[in-house]
Amino acid sequence: MEAFVSGGAGGVGAAAVVGVFVAAAVVGGFVAAVALAERAGVIAPRKRPNAPPAVPGLPIIGNLHQLKEKKPHQTFTKWAEIYGPIYTIRIGASSVVVLNSTEVAKEAMVAKFSSISTRKLSKALTVLTRDKSMVATSDYGDFHKMVKRYVMSSTLGTSAQKKFRDTRDMMINNMLSTFHKLVKDDPHVPLIFRDVFKDELFRLSMIQSLGEDVSSVYVDEFGRDISKEEIYNATVTDMMMCAIEVDWRDFFSYLSWVPNKSFETRVFTAEARRTAVMRALIKQQKERIVRGEVTKCIL
């Protein structure tokens, strides 16, 4: 500073330049702070023309405190009665548009499909789907169209339907027999339809995919045989439970570097168990193919 003062006019000019840089830094920092505050929800975001109504929330967390359930469809329905079939909510640092009617969802999925062809998955689904390797969760493109065509032809096509007709008839007969037996054993006890459907649908999927109703399989990673119930838990139940696991880092992307060990342990352990069981089932199927025991199946 003494050099600027002693420098006369030159010092005054240098001081002016420094003042300009300081002012620019202050203004830039203020703009950045406003942008971050708006993104975090501390201040209200700028209104966009024709934007859907927004559900009021709290700073930073948005509407997260109102979505305590893992399946918050009832909350969405209540909001639809107030704000209409289209509205926006804030989940942490992100804004989400909620479509809450059949007509609006159909328009979005059909007429506006190109605008939502890229699927934003949670961290749990990213792990469970092997980074969008499953057709239902993959981005719309060549891979999605190719795999969807294969799935449709091999499982839902006319020839596939005819090939597995007897298997479906067997499933229906098994369900009816089970229901009749339950009613006969105790007519006054309510029937739990879900358990019967679960057992028979899983049996159907095993027969169609592997050609037999697998009762057990040896898993190298476990060092033992696992039962059919354990196969179901590893390939179905655990996946459904992990799919709705919430990782708070999904809502605050700027904190994604913070570890969440409990979440990661649950999801990666379930995925590893699923992989081990599927590898064992495929290995067993290859051995059956070599022995000539496989008749009609998808795999």
Curated annotation (Swiss-Prot):
One Gene Ontology biological process: ent-kaurene oxidation to kaurenoic acid
Signal peptide residue numbers: none
Statement: the UniProt record of this protein carries the keyword Cell inner membrane: no
Entry GO MF terms: ent-kaurene oxidase activity; heme binding; iron ion binding; oxidoreductase activity, acting on paired donors, with incorporation or reduction of molecular oxygen, NAD(P)H as one donor, and incorporation of one atom of oxygen
Stretches that traverse the bilayer: 16-36
Main localization (coarse): membrane
GO CC field: chloroplast outer membrane
Keyword field: Membrane, Transmembrane, Transmembrane helix
Membrane topology category: Single-pass membrane protein
Xref: SUPFAM superfamilies: Cytochrome P450
Coiled-coil segments on the chain, per record: none
Compartments, record wording: Membrane
Annotated tissue distribution: Expressed in roots and panicles.
Family: Belongs to the cytochrome P450 family.
Protein name stated in the entry: Ent-kaurene oxidase-like protein 1
Biological classification of the source: Eukaryota, Viridiplantae, Streptophyta, Embryophyta, Tracheophyta
